[in-house]
Swiss-Prot record:
Record's subcellular location: Nucleus
Species annotation: Saccharomyces cerevisiae (strain YJM789) (Baker's yeast)
Compositional bias annotation for Basic and acidic residues: 35-49, 279-289, 324-333
Complex formation: During assembly of the complex, component of the small nucleolar ribonucleoprotein particles containing H/ACA-type snoRNAs (H/ACA snoRNPs) which contains CBF5, NAF1, NHP2 and NOP10 proteins. Interacts with SHQ1. Interacts directly with CBF5. Interacts with hyperphosphorylated C-terminal domain (CTD) of RNA polymerase II large subunit (RPB1).
Bias (Polar residues) ranges: 334-346
Single GO term (MF): RNA binding
Gene3D superfamilies: Probable tRNA pseudouridine synthase domain
Main localization (coarse): nucleus
Protein name (record): H/ACA ribonucleoprotein complex non-core subunit NAF1
Length: 492
């Protein structure tokens, strides 16, 4: 743009050019004296520039040189003022820093943490403490080293079972007092004991330092022991955090950003997994509570009804009968017999089931052998022999041709029953169900089952039934007697 103005001025030197120069937005008041000088120079430069337009190119060149000189001078003045301001600010900042340093003086000595102890407390024995000749002392190790008022004793006894506890008293063989135990360290097989001496016992430390290698003893009454398994339970650490604890996870620092990101990701996953597990446990507990609430109460459950044969009030049926049911049946039968006024009925030894020790229904033979067993139901015809012993011939079968109501011919040769008892029905045992064996037969497997009793058909026919039963028993006795005689004499 400046080239166009100069070319126009050269072409028309007599013509005035109305040129609007750009305004400077910089606040010259902040620049100090240089700004004022620039303000005074600007009108003069404008006048010279307007007068120089009519005087040729040489004058314009001189004007441009003067303008450049003025601009350089003004810029130089501005730079000087800016440098002065920066130097002033630096001096002010240094002054503020000096004031801060004066307000917070640096602490004297080493920096200590909150729980750090600068000096170790030294346990001291009473001044009048002495080891008499009667006091029992026990060898424990040898003097290993001495440094900075510390005496190290290397134990010769194993500490796998127990070790000395702080506060135990050590001495030499001549009962020279060493001091109290301060620390135990080293392996359990041969631990080390450290004894800290106070500064007031410098002479004792020098004496013990000369006597290194001698045996060390403990005062047995003042020795304190601790079991090793208690030490193994509390595992130590070498961390140097507060209270000698390791840094928590949230305070750990990483030198690698990737490792830190991976650690945070794993920690986040663990937290999410833990929340998921807690939510699952809560849901399970809710389900259990709902299930328990839905369970019916004991009062609303239907009552169990015992089987018909096991109920105390049930009628007599085939099967097991409880004791109460049997007693009730017995009472009912006795009451009905008393009301009917029935006469005593003779009952043989077979019905009493008490006439022999071996519970056989028939009398013993002279040789002590019982009768052979027979079928539980009476067979009116075609009685068969039992299987004969090995090597004997089978006898021929015979049929029962004795008419009803008459006694067989061999009945006269039979011996009468040895004993009969007449007992009223009220005192007899109640009849068992049809086909059920008596209790002593259940208990004794060798018991021969008697013929089943026919169910009662009324009080009028009961005596006839009993007489018929007696006849059947006599016939069976005759049959068994004949079989027994035939087995003893097979030639007949």
């Amino acid at each position: 743009m400046s080239d166009d103005l100069f070319s126009k001025a050269l072409e028309n030197p007599d013509q005035d050019l109305n040129v609007e120069l750009p305004k400077d937005d910089v606040d010259l008041g902040l620049l100090g004296d240089g700004g004022n000088e620039r303000k005074t120079d600007e009108p003069a430069a404008d006048a010279e520039r307007s007068t120089g337009l009519g005087s040729g190119s040489s004058e314009s060149e001189s004007d441009s040189g003067s303008d450049s000189d003025s601009d350089s001078g003004s810029s130089g003045s501005e730079d000087d003022s800016a440098d002065q301001d920066v130097e002033g600010e630096d001096e002010g900042g240094d002054a503020i820093e000096n004031e801060d340093e004066d307000e917070d003086p640096s602490p004297s000595g080493p920096i200590l943490s909150k729980n750090e102890i600068l000096e170790e407390t030294v346990p001291e024995l009473p001044e009048d403490y002495e080891i008499s000749e009667k006091t029992i002392i026990t060898p424990i190790g040898v003097l290993k080293s001495a440094f900075e008022n510390n005496i190290i004793i290397h134990a010769t006894m194993s500490g796998e079972k127990r070790v000395l506890k702080e506060g135990s008293i050590f001495c030499l063989e001549d009962r020279t007092l060493i001091g109290m135990l301060t620390e135990v360290f080293g392996p359990l097989q041969n631990p080390f004991y450290r004894i800290k001496l106070p500064d007031s016992k410098k002479n004792l430390f020098d004496e013990l330092k000369v006597r290194l290698g001698e045996k060390a003893f403990i005062v047995t009454p003042d020795a304190h022991w601790i079991d090793t398994f208690e030490l193994k339970r509390n595992k130590g650490t070498d961390a140097s955090n507060g209270y000698d604890e390791e840094l928590p996870e949230e305070e750990q620092e990483f030198s690698d950003d990737e490792k830190e990101a991976l650690f945070k990701k794993m920690k986040k996953q663990q937290q999410q997994r833990k929340k998921r597990d807690n939510r699952k446990l809560a849901n399970d507990s809710d389900n259990v509570k709902v299930k328990r609430a839905r369970q019916p109460k004991a009062n609303s459950l239907p009552k169990l009804v015992p089987p018909l044969g096991m109920s105390s009030n049930a009628p007599m049926q085939h099967g097991y009968k409880s004791r109460n049911a049997r007693e009730n049946i017995k009472r009912e039968s006795s009451a009905t017999s008393n009301r009917n006024g029935s006469s005593p009925v003779p009952i043989t030894q077979l019905h009493q089931q008490q006439f022999s020790a071996n519970n056989y229904p028939f009398p013993q033979q002279p040789n002590g052998m019982p009768y052979p067993p027979y079928s539980p139901f009476p067979q009116p015809t075609n009685f068969q022999y039992p299987p004969p012993p090995f090597g004997q011939a089978t006898p021929a079968q015979f049929s029962n041709t004795v008419p009803y109501g008459s006694l067989p011919p061999a009945y006269n040769n039979m011996s009468p029953p040895t004993q009969q008892s007449f007992m009223p029905m009220a005192q007899s045992q109640p009849p068992l169900p049809y086909g059920v064996p008596p209790m002593n037969q259940m208990q004794n497997p060798m018991y021969i089952q008697p013929p089943p009793q026919a169910p009662p058909q009324g009080n009028g026919n009961f005596q006839q039934v009993m007489e018929l039963h007696q006849i059947l028993l006599q016939q069976q006795q005759q049959q068994h007697q004949y079989q027994h005689q035939h087995q003893q004499d097979p030639r007949t």
